Amino acid sequence: YKISDIPSGNYSAVQFGIGVPKASNAKEPKDFSASSILSSPAEYWSSWKSYIFFRPEGKIALDGSTVFDTDFALHLGSDDALTTYDISRTIQIIDGQTTNVDITIDMQKFFNSVTLHDIENTPQIHSLVQLPIMKKLVENLKTAVK
């Protein structure tokens, strides 16, 4: 993600959110200009009336083998999922130069920090009845971002 107009100087932390503020989350992609990141219908969950903020997807091997043959898709969204992160990091911004700040998500912590996610029984999150499970994964995500 590219951010412009940060004054040059030395910074000791970065603060950012994963999610969409409630007022924006209440809107649909058609309500935003084409240049907005929120204009993409691929990131909107019409049945939840919410954007998807974090979407780990892939294949896993559930039987202990090395054959990754089971799909998983854990889509996190809703007003309750918006989380702000404060990460201590020395950052120097110099006029006219690009500064990169790497943010890492430890997926092992995402699946198994506060609560162990039972991916065998819940390999997909696509329904409002799964909101309690999604909230547990959001709590795990809080410990996984660094």
Report the location of each language-model feature.
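A short, solvent-exposed, low-complexity linear motif enriched for acidic/polar residues
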Residues: 1-146
